[in-house]
């Protein structure tokens, strides 16, 4: 199983209960039905954004920008589409079959070693969400106590290496724990006591679910525990088209400008973000969704300005992936990151 497939199939399975395979959810969320920008009468440019999975709290900036008309103000009519498979984004953008998509920094770096025609153009969630989460009912009070315990994962090899790095900080190795792939989902495995902890869960999603279920989770974001900082969710675009198609490059700039407005609005008003995502985020109770959205909103903050990505930070993470055997070829971060399309800070 590829790392992207594992990340989607394992981690997101528990989130999408009752959801259908493909969702096109933009039309009713604020895009102009007339196909024109009402402020100036100009025709809107249609574009599609392929999500990484079903609509969920990680996507609040997208849906709030849509609801507030921020994309329309940039001259765009944006459609969000959920993938039929979580490996779709990189492939379809590389082939030019969808203009933009949501992906992850580790997968984008891996795509660079595979020759895929993609580049990251903006960080939507500019910090790591992946966390080691320990059940409060396990009797384990810190990662140091995980020796001899069973830890669940979604099968993503990146997460396994992240766990290795976390354990190293506490003078443990993977050989001292039992790592199992929990096909039934990370949260059910914790609830049933099959595992004492999970890796691959997000601090703003699974940690909230587990707390609501009374497991009193202890949450350790991997980037605070020995893993290099990275951008969890990124916008990816077609690299060749960016270099050769001026209209496409303009569209990407306009999309990022609109998304930046949505991210700022979500941070300023998590209640507004909740109202925007609630109609499309399925499989959550209203109370749980609210807690997730309120936990997610501050994580959108980027001290360098919305969407900003550090090529040096990406290089550090790519080097870590290479040193841990997650990629077999070295990657020049500048080949998979284009940091020049996001709005200038303060604009």
What are these regions (language model features)?
Residues 25-28:
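C-terminal motif of bacterial Sec signal peptides marking the signal peptidase cleavage site
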Residues 106, 185-189, 193-281:
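Pocket-lining segment of extracytoplasmic ligand-binding domains
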Residues 1-17:
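Bacterial N-terminal signal peptides that target proteins for export
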Residues 245-324:
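Secondary-structure end/capping motifs
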Residues 30-33:
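Bacterial signal peptide processing site
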